């Protein structure tokens, strides 16, 4: 959670440093969209290795769900 907040603060500072006159610029819009997506209540949280899961989408990156008793695991093959 602290990492997400740090990223949001950095993005906000970067958007402020570009100046208000450039607010229609693509980078500024991207930073705003990312900030909104990260802070929205719909932002999903993924779990790392061993994290509790019931579906592959609950696991971060290339991790797959091995079931509630196993948790998120590294997989060489794509998740099902």
From Swiss-Prot:
Disulfide bonds join 46-60, 53-65, 59-72, 64-79. The keyword Disulfide bond applies. GO terms for molecular function: ion channel inhibitor activity; toxin activity. Keywords: Disulfide bond, Secreted, Signal, Toxin. It is found in: Secreted. Belongs to the conotoxin I3 superfamily. The cysteine framework is XI (C-C-CC-CC-C-C). This is Conotoxin Ca11.3. It comes from Conus caracteristicus (Characteristic cone).
């Amino acid at each position: 959670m602290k990492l997400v907040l740090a990223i949001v603060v950095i993005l906000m500072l970067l958007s402020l440093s570009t100046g208000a006159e450039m607010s229609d610029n693509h980078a500024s819009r991207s930073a705003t969209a990312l900030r909104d997506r990260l802070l929205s209540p719909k932002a999903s949280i993924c779990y790392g290795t061993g994290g509790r899961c019931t579906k592959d989408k609950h696991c971060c990156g290339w991790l797959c769900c091995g079931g509630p008793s196993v948790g998120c695991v590294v997989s060489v093959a794509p998740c099902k």
